[in-house]
Swiss-Prot record:
NCBIfam families: RNAP_delt_lowGC
Biased composition (Acidic residues): 106-177
Organism in which the protein naturally occurs: Bacillus cereus (strain G9842)
Family, similarity comment: Belongs to the RpoE family.
Keyword entries, A-Z: DNA-directed RNA polymerase, Nucleotidyltransferase, Transcription, Transferase
Subunit structure: RNAP is composed of a core of 2 alpha, a beta and a beta' subunits. The core is associated with a delta subunit and one of several sigma factors.
Record carries keyword Nucleotidyltransferase: yes
Function of the molecule: Participates in both the initiation and recycling phases of transcription. In the presence of the delta subunit, RNAP displays an increased specificity of transcription, a decreased affinity for nucleic acids, and an increased efficiency of RNA synthesis because of enhanced recycling.
Protein name as catalogued: Probable DNA-directed RNA polymerase subunit delta
Length: 177
């Protein structure tokens, strides 16, 4: 787009985005943001104060408009110049492969729950009768524990009775004095 053919009034009606699009189209190469701003100011006849006032909105418009692409390092170009596959290659930095750490062996085998089941029953036959017998033994032991508790309670009662007698005897002796 040749800007010389437009009158100053017509140029003032053009948006900064339209001017950038035509400038990049004429140059046919990526340009830094600062160079684009300088060319816009020159074409539109804007002062530095006017450019500074519109700079934030211009940058936002440049990012939002789908016709432009940021190529990194503050360089801008037209999206139509780059096929989709090339955009990914040029824009995205290639990730560096991460170094793998060596895993130190602790010398212990990993615990496998399946192995535990193999040692539960030596003859290979897991009978429910064995489980019932084990439960019976546990219950018998618990019954025996109750007898022990009864014996303890009786002993404590006997001790208490003896202490009570001793106390009564001591009281009688004190009264006599």
């Amino acid at each position: 787009m040749n800007f010389k053919q437009y009158s100053p009034e017509e140029l003032k009606e053009c948006s900064m985005i339209e001017v950038v699009h035509s400038v990049l189209g004429d140059k046919r190469q990526a340009t830094t943001f600062n160079e684009l701003v300088q060319e816009i100011a020159q074409v539109l006849g804007l002062s530095q104060e006017q450019v500074n006032a519109k700079l934030a909105q211009f940058y936002t418009d440049l990012n939002i408009d789908g016709r432009f692409i940021n190529l990194g390092e503050n360089r801008w170009g037209l999206r139509s110049w780059y096929p989709y596959e090339q955009i990914d290659e040029e824009i995205l930095p290639q990730p560096k492969p991460k170094k793998k750490r060596k895993v130190e062996e602790d010398g212990f085998d990993d615990y496998i729950e399946e192995d535990e089941d193999d040692f539960d029953d030596a003859d290979g036959n897991a009978d429910e009768e064995d489980d019932v017998e084990d439960l019976d033994k546990v219950l018998e032991e618990e019954d025996g524990d109750d007898d022990d508790l009864d014996d303890l309670e009786e002993d404590e009662e006997d001790d208490f009775a003896e202490e009570e007698l001793e106390y009564d005897e001591t009281e009688e002796e004190e009264e006599e004095l």
